[in-house]
Amino acid sequence: MPKPVLVIGGGIAGIQAALDLADQGIQVYLVEKTPSIGGKMMQLDKTFPTLDCSACILTPKMVAVARHPNIKLLTYSEVIEVTGSAGNFNVKILKKPRYVDEEKCIGCGICFNKCPSKVPDEFNLGMSQRRAIYVPFPQAVPLKATIDKEHCIYFTKQRCRVCEKVCPTKAINYEQKPETIELNVASIVVATGYQLIDPTLAAQYGYGKYQNVYISLEFERLLSSTGPTGGEIVRRSDNKHPKNIAFIQCVCSRDVKINPNCSAFCCMASVKHSILAKEHLPNVDCTIFYMDLRAFGKGYQEFYNRAMREFGVKFMRGKPAKIEEEPETKNLIITYEDTFTGLKKTMTFDMVVLAVGVKPIYPEALKLPLSEDGYVQLKNQYLDPVLTMIDGVYTVGVAAGAKDIPDSVVQSGNAAIKASILAGGAQK
């Protein structure tokens, strides 16, 4: 009988690792700190270079995780302590209270349609609102409501309780307490993903100051039919379609003052955004400002060529120095140096999208050594890029270095094989 394996992180990398392990007959505990699995990929409209629907790829895998007999899903939970060694890790997990009985909740949505408390929606990066009781997105797994205690009127003012009154299954439980779960596992797969670097650190671009400056993930949500505008690209300032859009690369990346690392997927993400913008608005002009364009993956160079030749996307080699706003029109004036001519130039755009760099998230409870670049230290990043400095702990996805979805999924399979060996091997 194989021993269990712990997977930390419910994004695409963690999901794939969990499925690969579970299909070998190994019991998997998949821990995700948010109310639903899915991760950043769930926020994407389409994937590059094929422009396949992101949710169409991911949601079947999310459902497969929930239904797999060998996977125990622990959402809204965090690993708080790890002791022991390879083959015999003792793990403590804190399961936070949803204040909703998961066994009773049927995900009907009546509670959050009636809730009077409105909060900026994290899934849409604050561009829309959710209620104090909510599910993160319609395809959430598990499709169970969660009460945001900090914004719930009952918890903050001791009144309301509307959700309790309207719930048809009596699932609301304001007395729910945190729960500590203790596990013994053979190995651990770290798939904790990344967070975006604060774009206001690049103050010269005016993010948060100028309404029509967006970050790439915000633009992704604008493109999505499930996003705050229903898939319509409109400006924050006047709700009008932009006539021209600038995409600026390497914001908070390859910058010695903020983050010297390349974030790997930003170049192709911006190429994708420019193509999708042209599909949504055929007459829009798209210009990508870049230092070096890195099209290293399968089909990436062809994707870049397609953007230029088929869609007429312009590529301007030169990193903008600053952005200024025209007060009346809210248009944005970009000052940059054209590195091919050496001339200082300005261009005016209706909308600017910043390709912001990323930094890893890693579980502090594991006390994993970090490399100089801030990612999890690997034993040998060239020969085996999943082995950490702690035997029995493997890392996949962006936790060990910035990478795209295909590379993350490949790593997950690698880590699953190694984790299964410590667990006792595949069982039918």
Language model regions located:
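Residues forming the flavin
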Residues: 1-428
